[in-house]
From Swiss-Prot:
Binds two calcium ions per molecule with an affinity similar to that of the S100 proteins. Keywords: Antimicrobial, Antioxidant, Apoptosis, Autophagy, Calcium, Cell membrane, Chemotaxis, Cytoplasm, Cytoskeleton, Immunity, Inflammatory response, Innate immunity, Membrane, Metal-binding, Repeat, S-nitrosylation, Secreted, Zinc. S100A8 is a calcium- and zinc-binding protein which plays a prominent role in the regulation of inflammatory processes and immune response. It can induce neutrophil chemotaxis and adhesion. Predominantly found as calprotectin (S100A8/A9) which has a wide plethora of intra- and extracellular functions. The intracellular functions include: facilitating leukocyte arachidonic acid trafficking and metabolism, modulation of the tubulin-dependent cytoskeleton during migration of phagocytes and activation of the neutrophilic NADPH-oxidase. Pfam families: EF-hand_1, S_100. Residues 12-47, 46-81 form the EF-hand domain. This is Protein S100-A8. Found essentially in phagocytic cells. It is a peripheral membrane protein.
Length: 89
């Protein structure tokens, strides 16, 4: 049986592939698919930055796609913001 953390990691991978496979590439989420991912999976965190801003910030190697490592930067940033929100309440 998987632990809660293992399930969470598998969920992150599944979400990434859900959007990376839209263009048939396991290794890249492209600009329009990142926009859809952000709007669908974390709309609460789209209030401060639009999809284009996120894309420019995340595409560290500037290859025109968000690889899984770059996606994890998004997860960290959104996770930190969510953690702050939880402790405000």
């Amino acid at each position: 049986m998987l632990t809660d953390l293992e399930c969470a990691i598998n969920s992150l991978i599944d979400v990434y592939h859900k959007y990376s496979l839209k263009k048939g590439n396991y290794h890249a989420v492209y600009r329009d698919d990142l926009k859809q991912l952000l709007e669908t999976e974390c709309p609460k965190f789209m209030k401060k930055k639009d999809a284009d801003t996120w894309f420019k910030e995340l595409d560290i190697n500037q290859d025109g796609g968000i690889n899984f490592e770059e996606f994890l930067v998004l997860v960290i940033k959104v996770g930190l913001e969510a953690h702050e929100e939880i402790h405000k309440e």
